[in-house]
From Swiss-Prot:
The gene is uvrC. This is UvrABC system protein C. Pfam families: GIY-YIG, HHH_5, UVR, UvrC_RNaseH, UvrC_RNaseH_dom. GO terms for molecular function: DNA binding; excinuclease ABC activity. The UvrABC repair system catalyzes the recognition and processing of DNA lesions. UvrC both incises the 5' and 3' sides of the lesion. The N-terminal half is responsible for the 3' incision and the C-terminal half is responsible for the 5' incision. GO terms for cellular component: cytoplasm; excinuclease repair complex. It comes from Pseudomonas syringae pv. tomato (strain ATCC BAA-871 / DC3000).
């Protein structure tokens, strides 16, 4: 604890009412936000001479100032605490890294509605189903619906401008409503069945499909009967996978597990007795190391963190603590509806609870095992580089382009716990000779390290460059120009066979050349980081190239600016469909005159 902070003097004037407290260090950086039923009693507990966990002791040692806000009750304190945590993200609080809105299945209005994934505000007209706990869970449901009922999932702009069915029709994933290959009444029936499935009425849907199958067979419509038989078989398979015996309501099953290496919270989402999916959360554990504290902090941030998440009627948890009564009041007050938190459960609910606990334990064990695996590779690299201790931060750069087109440089960052994706960066390379990888790398490194020198970001301990002597020399020139000190430069080039395991490595200056055995953990780490930089560069390049190619063909046409280009491509569903359109069809697009349509058509067919 700093000498400038006197806890005795502070506690002498501290209120014993409910409220929120904020702890700051000597630089006025917010360290921790907490709530209390009795502020004075809670804050006094921090300054006991014994009994602190290591993280709590580290926090107390940094305190230079404490501010408090008195509230009318504990519920108000909890709501204010969550607002401050979300705004400031203090380092000693438990923090959820996931803050995205959860996805829904969206069914649009119209004669031929579309099924799609939706995040964010529900502004479009139609129906929303969910939320689903992950994008993977929602894609699984959409894939099943596509196979079973063949409701379209294409963009409206693509749908409106088809003159022949697409590949989805050929592989029996769509019935071709875009070109009139299915009657509106038949399509509406498929949509109705999809809605029944999404609402969790799978048993009623199975009964209805079975009855329709028997009716079709009696009418000797064997083709229709076979189609319905396949739908029933698919549906039964999914029911077996997703059903929760004895469950009919909307329930979230949440289990928290904590050990010295970290924490995991596993959430299973059940809607209408059907499992929509599950998700692991690995919160940044602050000073609360008890599993009950982790659970209450998770639920508070999950349901009060500002993200639009559906409130289930019941949440089953594996642990509770004294904060739960105030937590339930705060959630119900904030969300405007009742919710039950259950802990001591029996029968089916007890099995759900245990399943969530098992998943949380296994997920954390797997995460820690992977972290230890990466850490051991860092230790091996330290031996190779003759370092006293493992490096804490590695950066790797790569270049991707197609014959010089849409050049993108990538920067990926790794630490002993694995990739640090929040620090990944891409650089769109401009103003260099097409295909000049040296110039592209020079520009990327200059931009990156100029920003770091200006205080934006951290210097790595090791800079890994994917390339041979030329790239190494160029990287060294950049570091010298910018006067970047004490940075280990490591180059990796493919060997003569160009196979993994035969790489040639260069250390600091290109003259220091060596290789590592194919089974070397240090080499495996280098390969892992290099491959990740390559992947990140390629995905960025493809996105940039696709955007360029979608617009470049239209850029030289007088009267077609950026807005019209975007509107044209959106109207026709892409450049390929626009190229197939006639002059009259182009003229029907919003804001396009007959004369401009003729000019667009002529430019698109000039070759």
């Amino acid at each position: 604890m700093t000498q400038t902070f006197d806890p005795s003097a502070f506690l002498a004037t501290c209120s014993g009412r409910p409220g929120v407290y904020r702890m700051f260090d000597a630089d006025a950086t917010l360290l921790y936000v907490g709530k209390a039923k009795n502020l004075k009693k809670r804050l006094a507990s921090y300054f006991r001479k014994t009994g602190h966990a290591p993280k709590t002791g580290a926090l107390v040692a940094r305190i230079a100032q404490i501010e408090t806000t008195i509230t009318n009750n504990e519920t108000e304190a909890l709501l204010l605490e969550q607002t401050l945590i979300k705004e400031w993200r203090p380092p000693y609080n438990i923090l959820l890294r996931d803050d995205k809105s959860y996805p829904y299945v969206f069914l649009s209005d119209g004669t031929y509605p579309r099924l799609s994934i939706h995040r964010g505000a529900k502004k479009a007209k139609g129906r929303y189903f969910g939320p689903y706990p992950s994008a993977g869970a929602i894609r699984e449901s959409l894939s099943l619906l596509q196979k079973t009922f063949q409701v379209r999932q294409c963009e409206d702009s693509f749908f409106k401008n088809r003159n022949r069915p697409c590949l989805q029709y050929q592989i029996k994933r769509c019935k071709g409503p875009c070109v009139g290959l299915v009657e509106p009444e038949v399509y509406a029936e498929d949509v109705r069945h999809s809605v029944m499935f999404l609402e969790g009425r799978s048993n009623a849907l199975s009964d209805e499909l079975n009855a329709s199958m028997e009716k079709a067979a009696m009418a000797l419509d064997f083709e229709r009967a076979a189609e319905l038989r396949d739908q029933v078989a698919l549906l039964r398979r999914v029911q077996d996978q997703q059903s929760m015996d004895g469950g009919t309501g909307d329930v979230d099953v949440v289990a928290a597990f904590v050990n010295p290496g970290g924490a995991c919270v596993h959430l299973i989402s059940v809607r209408g007795g059907r499992v929509l999916g599950s998700k692991n959360f690995f919160p940044q554990v602050g000073i609360e190391e008890e599993v009950g504290e982790v659970m209450s902090a998770f639920l508070a941030q999950y349901f009060l963190g500002g993200v639009d998440r559906e409130l289930p009627s019941e949440v089953i948890v594996n642990v509770v603590n004294e904060d739960f009564p105030a937590l339930i009041d705060a959630i119900e007050e904030s969300r405007g509806r009742e919710m039950t938190i259950s802990h001591r459960v029996r029968g089916t609910r007890a099995r759900w609870q245990q399943l969530a606990v098992t998943n949380a334990e296994q997920a954390l064990a797997a995460r820690l095992a992977n972290r230890q695996h990466v850490a051991s590779r860092f230790e091996a690299l330290a031996v190779v580089l003759n370092l006293d201790e493992p490096p804490m931060r590695l950066e790797c750069y790569d270049i991707s382009h197609s014959s010089g087109e849409a050049t993108v440089a990538s920067c990926v960052v790794f630490g002993p716990e694995g990739p640090i994706k929040s620090d990944y960066r891409r650089f769109n390379i401009e103003g260099v000779t097409a295909g000049d990888d040296y110039a592209a790398m020079h520009q990327a490194l200059t931009r990156r390290y100029s920003r770091i020198k200006a205080g934006e970001g951290k210097l790595p301990d090791v800079l890994l460059v994917d390339g041979g002597k030329g790239q190494m020399s160029m990287a060294r020139d950049v570091l010298n120009e910018l006067q970047v000190p004490d940075l280990i430069l490591l180059g990796v080039a493919k060997g003569t066979t160009r196979k993994a395991g035969f790489e040639t490595l260069y250390l600091n200056d290109a003259a220091h050349e060596f290789t590592l055995p194919g089974d070397s953990p240090a080499l495996h780490l280098i390969q892992q980081i290099r491959d990740e930089a390559h992947r990140f560069a390629i995905t960025g390049h493809r996105a940039r190239r696709g955007k360029t190619r979608r617009t470049s063909t239209l850029e030289g046409i007088a009267g077609v600016g950026p807005t019209r280009r975007r509107d044209l491509l959106k109207h026709f569903g892409g450049l390929q469909e626009l190229s197939r359109a006639s002059i009259d069809e182009i003229a029907k697009a919003p804001g396009i005159s007959k004369k401009l349509a003729e000019s667009i058509y002529a430019n698109l067919h000039s070759e």
